[in-house]
Structures are given as structure tokens and as C-alpha cells.
Amino acid sequence: MNPVIKKFQFGQSTVTLETGRIARQASGAVLVTVDDDVSVLVTVVGAKQADPGKGFFPLSVHYQEKTYAAGKIPGGFFKREGRPSEKETLTSRLIDRPIRPLFPEGFMNEVQVVCTVVSTSKKTDPDIAAMIGTSAALAISGIPFDGPIGAARVAFHESTGYLLNPTYEQLAASSLDMVVAGTEEAVLMVESEAKELTEDQMLGAVLFAHDEFQSVIKAVKELAAEAAKPTWDWDWAAAPEATELLGAIRAEFGEAISQAYTITVKADRYARLGELKDQVVAKLSGEEGQPSASDVKAAFGEIEYRTVRENIVNGKPRIDGRDTRTVRPLNIEVGVLPKTHGSALFTRGETQALVVATLGTARDAQLLDTLEGEKKDPFMLHYNFPPFSVGECGRMGGAGRREIGHGRLARRSVQAMLPAADVFPYTIRVVSEITESNGSSSMASVCGASLALMDAGVPMKAPVAGIAMGLVKEGEKFAVLTDILGDEDHLGDMDFKVAGTAKGVTALQMDIKIKGITEEIMEIALGQALEARLNILGQMNQIIGQSRTELSANAPTMIAMKIDTDKIRDVIGKGGATIRAICEETKASIDIEDDGSIKIFGETKEAAEAARQRVLGITAEAEIGKIYVGKVERIVDFGAFVNILPGKDGLVHISMLSDARVEKVTDILKEGQEVEVLVLDVDNRGRIKLSIKDVAAAKASGV
């Protein structure tokens, strides 16, 4: 073994790249260690044979966190890692997005990237180490790849400015959590959430990260110079263009294709383009000496691509007739589902989201078992994309990677505007059902989520809206598009999603398919996005401008109270018997914290209030000079014990029964009898002294 090791400084951290010691049968393998904090093993394997029948580049990225990395044993019956967690799925997507555009066009060999977290101190997120390792493993693998890439996480504090690769603790106090990846020349991917930062601050963070991760790219190049395998014998040049075929299609069908792209209804447009494609295939393939049907279809697609892009950069109307800055018509409704806690139907052109907010108790929070330990998440946002939303039949089942990713983006967009847990201690679940889709369904989910939460009475700090921007760049000409359609996303060069309030940005996601995106283009895109966001917020505010002052009648009632910590065991009871009895009898749920904070949730106000009274009864202290209605529990020779509060009995001495002389207590009282008693005293041992004979005088004096 002759391992090759490269060390470099990355911000405050020392990063070590090592290859040649572990996983030597992979095409490329790198162990990335950041200080003594995180170690990630990244392997890349490329199939030697192409699979052109797939019709897409078969790249798969698998990020996995092993529990042994944090010195833990997995839970569950089998005691081993199972299906990928949401965090693992999202990180896999984060790594996939910047590397996918850097493989050559037409490359159809399967490539699999596996990133395994093998050691962590749980202080920082291992995702940046995994991205650096992926860049390095690809660079030394010999697989055709136009890298390397660098990656960095950026935080922001008003007082100290931008911070490179923050710890979890530093992120908690930050106004920004942004991951940026790209090549030496260009930014390729941005994923972020923020607390209402300005567009300039967001752009500054992107440029800061790009400058900082140049050290990563330099180190990877140095590693590759020493340890890279021979580059595959792959023809990087694209297949020779079928000039004659393209010319024939354009000559005979070019005008018809151009006209088809003026049909504004997506289904009608697709139907017309399908007819034209069939006509082209029938006319130009099938006979001996003619191109194959697949070649003709590919050429037809190229004509479509060029037609749409040429129209846009030359200033012609877009597919649906809009100019570059106009948002599609909006239709907004709230309270559309009578039995839900909050609901909204948000329609933008041919994209529609039915969004529902549900409030639950603290026990409904999602339990997350992470490398950092178990924690509860009181906010969930789930995004569903059924096949009928695009007029197709398809698989129904659990959420895929795309749905998980879109749901997380929508969650990031609204999370900063949610109230603090001590102000609004409900668990919140938002579900976005995409019922129609023609571009930017994730941003429709953001708008719908904000509306549904306000409809449910969740005290949002401010309404949130989102917009998707696109880009078409041909040479020096470019056009930034507001509110892109599905076709514009597919045929364009950039997907740029921005969400925020009227005050600032709360989420930014960017994926770029080409090189040469300049600071100027990003600045224009952010400016147009702000203009569109304010337009959408204005229309949303006309329907519901602030959260409802009362929760839905269908939502659970929550009562918060606090008791002395010494009383917690009294409320819980032996083996939980007391609290269990209260919950069963009142149909409410009770959560008690170690500091004595209690949250009572009831399906109705009456249930919650009944439980509160029971808790008050258990925790209340007898007040000297107060009259109580009590029940005689036990009679003794010298008096009677009367229960005045749950678990609290006081003694009425025989001399305190009546002004007249009493021979026997049973002459006055019997067990089970209800009587009014006055609290005379409570000694330092908690013993309560009661009187019956002084009740009348106390009442007369106004007690």
C-alpha cells in the first residue's frame, strides 16, 4: 500500500484527503478527515460499458450515516441501519446536483457514488466533507468528469459577517445556513435557508463561498496529479450533428413547431407536438437508407429546444404569451376544507397546490434518531406529487427523493416565520397536495403553506411567498425568466427558486446547468424574484393578510400552566396512575416538563379545562382563612379528618365542631358527609387545622 495524502487549510479547519489505503478496488476512493471532527469515506465506481438504452445518464449518489461513527448502536429489532433517513436522502441530492452537469453529454456509463460517514464528533454536519470527497474521488477515478468541484457552508451574523463551515452551535445563532458548490470558474448549486436577509446579503454569501472553496479545488487537483488513474478512452466530443436531418425537419415542420409553442394550454400544446413528432417520424424514417426513428425523435427534440430558446433570447413572447417579468394569473382561496384546522387552494396558471395545516399535541412531534442523538421536531411539511397532477398514470406510494427534496425546500421557506415553541407550543404538520403542475410546484407549496398556517390561526411573523426563476443564455445574449413553466425549466439553463417575506429572503435554491453564470445574471434574477414575490404577497394579503386571531374550532385546545417542581410526582402519581386516570377520564393529554411546565391538550375546550381543574386540585395548597367544602373521611375520638383538596386532609378537633359541648364526634358528623370547614392553620409539616364552628362567623365577616 502506498497511500497518497494531501492536507490543506479550509477556513479554520485542516482537511486531509487520503487515497490508496481503503477501498482500492473502487474506481476512486478518498477518505476525507476534517480536523478530528468528521471522517467520510467516499467511493466512486463507473461501469466500463455504456447503457444507451436508458435514455438518461445513470448516476446514483448514496450518502449514509453509520451509527458506529458516533459510538451508537442502532435501535429497532434488527439493530442495524435500515432505509435512508430524510437527512441522508437530502444530502444525497445535495451531492448529486452539482456533479451531474459536469459529466459529458452522451455519457451513458453507470456511475455510483457512495459517501459513508465513518466517524463524527457530532459538532458539524458531515455533508461538506462528503461533497469534497466526491469531488476528489471522481478526480482520481479516470471517469470523464469536468471537475473538480468545491463546496462550502456559510453562516451569517449581523455583527461578525460571513462565517465559513460553522458548527451546529454556530448555526443555531446564525441568520443563514447556505451550502454552495461549484467549479473554479462558476457556481453550480446553492441550497439555503435564512431569516429575512436581503438579496445583496444572499448574493454576498454565494460569492464568499465561491472564493473560499478555491482551496478545495486546488487541493483536489494536487491529489489527482499524484494519484489519478488514466483517463478513460472516451470521446468527449458530442456525436456529429445530423445537420441534414435537422435541416429537413426545420424546412418542412419548423413553422408548425414554432406555432405549436404558441398554444398556451399545456395539454393542447403537448397533443399538437405529439402529432407533429409522429408526422416527422413517419416521413423521415422507416425506409432503407433513412435515419432511425430514435434519431429522428432526437432531432425533433433538438429543433424544439432551439425554437423555444431562440424565441426567448430574441425577445419574442414566451410559450404562454407572457414577457420575461410577468407572473401567471393567481387564484387564491382559504378555508376550502371545512373540517381541517387550516387550508388553502393556491393556483398560479396551470400549477395548483391544495395545502392543509394540522395542529397537534407535543406528543405528535416527529421523533428523529440522528447521529447527534434523539430529538423531537414539532414542525413537518410534506409534499405530494401524484401522477394525475400532470395528466398521467403512474406509481402511487411512498415519497420519492424529489418529493422529499421539494418538501424540505418549502419547509425551509416558511420555518423562520413560525412562532417560537414557548409562544405556540403546538406540533404543526403541513401537507401540500400538488393537484396540477406546470412549473414551480414547490413555490406554490410555499405560498399555500403560508396561507393555510394563517388560516389555522398559527401566529406567523409574516406571510411568505416563493417564485421560480429561469435563464436562457445563448452566447452573450441572455434572458432571465420570472415564474417559469415546466417546459422552460426543462429547456432552460438555470432553476433559481427564491422564497421570502416583504422584508427579506427566507430560502434560496439554485441549480445551474451551464458554465458562465455571472454575478450580473444572479443579481438580475434576485431583483426580478423580489419584484414577483412582492406582487404575489400583495395578492395573498388581499385574501388573508395576517393570522386568524382564534384557532379553528376543529383544532385541539391547549392550556399551559406551571406547578411547583415538588408537586410533579403528585400529578404523575405512583407508576403514573394519577396522570393516567386524569387523561382517561377527561379525554385530554398532559405533558409535564422537569421545570414544572404543563401543557394540557384537549379535543374540546371542556376536556382541557376539566383536566386543568384536576391538576389544580392536586397541586393546590390549603389557604389559611379560606372556607372549603370537604368530605368527612375518618372519625376518631378527638375529632374528624376532612378531605378539602385531592390528597389533602385536615383535622377538625372535637372542640372545633360546635360552640356547644360535644360528647361524641358521631353526634355531629358521620363518614362520607359533606361539610363546610374553615382553614385555621397549616403547620411547617403541612398539617392542616380546620374548624366547623367558625364558618358562620367567617362568612359574616366576608371571607
UniProtKB/Swiss-Prot annotation:
InterPro entries: ExoRNase_PH_dom1 (IPR001247), ExoRNase_PH_dom2 (IPR015847), ExoRNase_PH_dom2_sf (IPR036345), KH_dom (IPR004087), KH_dom_type_1 (IPR004088), KH_dom_type_1_sf (IPR036612), NA-bd_OB-fold (IPR012340), PNPase (IPR012162). GO terms for biological process: mRNA catabolic process; RNA processing. Transmembrane segments: none annotated. SMART domains: KH, S1. Residues 625-693 form the S1 motif domain. It is found in: Cytoplasm. It comes from the Bacteria. The keyword Lipid metabolism does not apply. Its cofactor is Mg(2+). It catalyses: RNA(n+1) + phosphate = RNA(n) + a ribonucleoside 5'-diphosphate. Its EC number is 2.7.7.8. Component of the RNA degradosome, which is a multiprotein complex involved in RNA processing and mRNA degradation. HAMAP family: PNPase. Involved in mRNA degradation. Catalyzes the phosphorolysis of single-stranded polyribonucleotides processively in the 3'- to 5'-direction. This is Polyribonucleotide nucleotidyltransferase. It comes from Pseudomonas fluorescens (strain ATCC BAA-477 / NRRL B-23932 / Pf-5). The lineage of its organism: Bacteria, Pseudomonadati, Pseudomonadota, Gammaproteobacteria, Pseudomonadales.
